[in-house]
Amino acid sequence: MNPMDIHTLTKRDEIRRCLQIARDLPGWFNEAGLRAMERDLGEERTFVAIEGGDVLGFVTVKPLNERALEILWMAVRRELRGKGIGTEMLLFAEEWAKERGFEVLVVKTSGDLSYEPYDATRRFYELRGFVRIALIDPYPGWGEPALVYVKCLKRK
């Protein structure tokens, strides 16, 4: 088995494969989200996890300012969830951010606490040091509640 590699998305084919991963997760990504994701994959920094030529997952980030970096999108192929790929991508993004002077990582996720698919998403971020700082209901442009999480990045 080939070791997993994480690198910056550069190939058009990788964008297509990232979008397919998201399409295969309809409980997390709706059509409006997929359209926004397609735009962001082409315009923002995206890291892809690759093994043996296969895209396993991706994370897209965008600077909010000189100190804060936001995770816009993150997904791992459905059949590979829970195997540490998301954690590795997150650690990669954190190191990338620290090397560029970012001090805070921000992520927004569904704030609808009755919607079960996002329970695992919220738990994922919380177990990796993210702290809920706000519930915005409704979140502008989403039409639904959003939870905002932050994580302070420690420099070595």
Model-derived features: positions:
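Conserved G/P- and acidic residue-centered "switch" motifs that form tight phosphate/ATP-binding loops
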Residues: 84
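Acetyl-CoA-dependent GNAT
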Residues: 8-72, 77, 90-91, 96, ...
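Short glycine/proline-centered loop/turn elements that form peptide/ligand docking sites
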Residues: 116-121, 135-145
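A short, internal acetyl-CoA/4′-phosphopantetheine-binding micro-motif in the GNAT/acyltransferase core
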Residues: 74-81, 111-113
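Short hydrophobic/aromatic beta-strand or adjacent loop that forms the aromatic wall/cage
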Residues: 44, 144-148
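Conserved active-site tyrosine of GNAT-family acetyltransferases
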Residues: 125, 130
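Conserved GNAT acetyl-CoA-binding A-motif
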Residues: 97-117
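Residues forming the Rossmann-fold NAD(P)(H) cofactor-binding site
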Residues: 87
